[in-house]
């Protein structure tokens, strides 16, 4: 069994951060160690919430606590998602380095949560800079959306060709794999939901239906990152992991749309997470 330390937000009600990622990874047979960066009543897109950002010291303390019981070397991957403060970025990077000193084969997937194409950058002051200057160089895999693709690459991204250039620029900065979770308005077809995967071996594009909602569900990127790393840990190739992730997420979105719900219907769609009914294929473009 593979083990993942998932350092993300937690919501008591609904699905975002670790609530979106943990159960799907477990469904794929991965043991998840959930370490929460915030604990909120619900996700922030409701416009009101209660809760707190977890003190930065707790991240390192918890990781050292796992090491104290001689279990840290079992960690096969670290996932970081929504980060509540700039100080947490440094703590997470230190934790990644410490874990890799115990298990040099451990992977670090950085989901560089900064914002949304329609909302801009919405994280706390200093988080964006920490992700760009610290986390990206440590990451083996990174999973930006359109906003994050622009910020991480430092390049304008207004069309499909520029998106490919930005992905190549990020690869040159350290990560071995770049998964663009959603190309949004710079994809090839605005009526579709499009993703990119780039490695040293090339670049692949996948397109699936763009589901319409009265209110767009939150947590899709967290689900995507979790499924991708779980598939890789289970021995799937990059392309197999990419396709399974895209298809499973599409099925979750279909079930969520059918139930007309603002929250991702992860439990209702659990069978599709394990065995997607969608069969969209990745196409090599470079």
Curated annotation (Swiss-Prot):
Amino-acid positions noted as binding substrate in the UniProt annotation, renumbered to this chain: 9, 44-45, 222
Catalyzed reaction equations: pyridoxal + ATP = pyridoxal 5'-phosphate + ADP + H(+)
Signal peptide bounds: none
UniProt GO molecular function: ATP binding; magnesium ion binding; pyridoxal kinase activity
Pfam families assigned: Phos_pyr_kin
Keyword Kinase: yes
SUPFAM superfamilies in the cross-refs: Ribokinase-like
InterPro entries in UniProt: PM/HMP-P_kinase-1 (IPR013749), PyrdxlKinase (IPR004625), Pyridoxal_kinase_PdxY (IPR023685), Ribokinase-like (IPR029056)
A GO CC annotation given for this chain: cytosol
BP GO terms, sorted: pyridoxal 5'-phosphate salvage
Pathway: Cofactor metabolism; pyridoxal 5'-phosphate salvage; pyridoxal 5'-phosphate from pyridoxal: step 1/1
Function: Pyridoxal kinase involved in the salvage pathway of pyridoxal 5'-phosphate (PLP). Catalyzes the phosphorylation of pyridoxal to PLP.
Assembly and binders: Homodimer.
Name listed for the protein in its UniProt record: Pyridoxal kinase PdxY
Species in which this protein is naturally found: Pasteurella multocida (strain Pm70)
